[in-house]
Structure formats: C-alpha cells, structure tokens
C-alpha cells in the first residue's frame, strides 16, 4: 500500500536517492536537501512524500514566499519514481498538499513546473496555467517599469544570501549548454536601471521579461507559470498576467554560477 505523509529527518537519504535516479542533474545530496528544507529563511517549509514498502517513491515540496500580503507558497521538487509515475501517486501527493494548505489558510501556491507536468496539474488537479515565461536574449535589460506590479516574490537580505550566497543588487549567472555560454539575469532589485551586457564583459543577456509572457503555448520552449488558488476571493486578480513579475532566479532550476 502506498502511503502519503510529511517527510521527516529519517527520509532525507531516501528522498535524495529518489532525486538521483535519472542522472542527478541538480547534484542532489543530503546537504542540498537540508539547504532547501532546513536552512530556508522562512518558516513553513514542507516536504511531502509517497512511500511504498519503506521506499520513497514520490516527492513534492513547498517553500513559503513573500508576495504582497498573501499567504503564499512556491511549489518545488516534484518527482516520482518512473516505475510508479501515475495519477494515483500524483493525486495522493496533491491531496496531502491541498489538505495542508487548507488547514493553514494558504491563499495560493504557485510554481514553474516543466510543461508536461503543468498540463497534468491543470487537467486533473485544479491548477491554472496563467501564462508562459518566454526567454528574451538582448544586449541589455531593464525591469524598472515592472517593479510596481503587485505580484512578485519579495527577497529579504536573508533570502538573497540563502538563494545566491551573497547580497547584491543584480545576479548574472553563466550557463553552458550545447557548446556555448549564455548569461542569465537571475535577479535584479528595483534599484537596478537599464543595464548593458558589455558592462559585465559579455555580449548579451538571457532573461524572463513581462514582454515575453504569453498565454498560449508556442513552438519555442517556454516555462509555464501555474497557480492553485485556495482563497477564491482573489482569483481574478491572481490570474491576471499583468499583475505578475517573475524573475528567473525565482525558480530553483536556475543554479547561480557567478561570472568571476
């Protein structure tokens, strides 16, 4: 029988083993797990697991985030053992998640899942894919006019230190793929104005930008942004893309690798 519950300290190695089954692209280890689920600066981190015969076969995590005055969460680290990857296991994990959110009067949970998982969540589990985050590549960036949007993740200095390892105004990360480097703007605070790539010694930047949010999926890859709303009083406002500003660094999928 598959059971669903909140993870404890004794589950860490089992969860790391689960995450490492398909190549461990994100270098999961006991230390990395503790970074997210024990060292996170805000209270209310939860790790949900599915277990079968004393083996962890599924996982979903939530991190509390500061978005306006809402009680908000960010969903992370969804993974199910390929042998058990079916709606029954996903449903059990999300039922645990939903019950916890209702018990704790959460307004909503948001996430940037992979496109396939986003479709599953939207079709079967009450999530809404409200827009897709398209990638822009340009020789400069400016987010100034979008920092007045009401829905964004607010980073304290403690959060910046936890996420990036140091506190500064802007974080440019280098990323190697398919034989070439790209330089990603993971985060810029509202004091950062128009910024040119050549000031960092690179040709161009890659980043998410509200001008590249789109409702319908296109041929080029984009990252879905999805949300599950528990306080329906705010549904209209929360599902309006024009109220959101999401940066690449909001997703833990983008690992910060400094230029120097």
List where the protein language model places each region.
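Amide-forming acyltransferase catalytic core, primarily the GNAT-like/NAT-type
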Residues: 13-52, 102-108, 115-197
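A short beta-loop-alpha structural element at the N-terminal edge
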Residues: 3-15
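Short, histidine-centered active-site or binding-site loop motifs used for metal coordination
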Residues: 19, 77-82
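Conserved acetyl-CoA-binding loop-helix of GNAT-fold acetyltransferases
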Residues: 80, 85-101, 197-208
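Short beta-strand micro-motifs in enzyme catalytic cores
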Residues: 46-48, 71-73, 171, 224-228
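Conserved beta-strand in the GNAT
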Residues: 49, 55-64, 72-74, 79, ...
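Active-site/acyl-donor-binding loops of N-acyltransferases
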Residues: 64, 108-149, 186-260
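Hydrophobic residues on conserved beta-strands that form the core of alpha/beta folds
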Residues: 4, 75, 194-196
């Amino acid at each position: 029988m598959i059971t669903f519950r909140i993870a404890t300290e004794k589950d860490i190695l089992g969860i790391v083993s689960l995450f490492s089954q398909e190549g461990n692209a994100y270098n999961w280890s006991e230390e990395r797990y503790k970074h997210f689920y024990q060292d996170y600066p805000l209270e209310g981190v939860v790790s949900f697991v599915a277990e079968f015969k004393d083996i962890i076969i599924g996982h979903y995590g939530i991190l509390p985030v500061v978005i306006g005055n809402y009680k908000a969460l960010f969903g992370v680290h969804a993974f199910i053992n390929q042998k058990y990857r079916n709606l029954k296991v996903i449903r059990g994990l999300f039922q645990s998640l939903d019950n916890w959110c209702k018990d704790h009067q959460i307004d909503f949970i948001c996430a940037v899942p992979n496109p396939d998982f986003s479709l599953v969540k939207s079709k079967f589990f009450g999530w809404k894919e409200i827009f897709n985050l398209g990638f822009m590549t340009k020789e400069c960036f400016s987010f100034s006019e979008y920092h007045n949007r009401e829905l964004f993740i607010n980073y304290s200095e403690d959060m910046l230190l936890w996420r990036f390892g140091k506190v500064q105004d802007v974080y440019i990360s280098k990323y190697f793929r398919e034989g070439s480097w790209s330089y990603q703007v993971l985060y810029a605070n509202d004091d950062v104005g128009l910024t040119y790539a050549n000031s960092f010694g690179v040709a161009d930047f890659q980043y998410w930008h509200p001008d590249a949010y789109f409702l319908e999926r296109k041929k080029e890859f984009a990252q879905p942004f999805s949300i599950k709303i528990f306080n329906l009083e705010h549904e209209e406002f929360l599902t309006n893309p024009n109220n959101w500003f999401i940066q690449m660094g909001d997703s833990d999928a983008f690992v910060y690798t400094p230029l120097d």
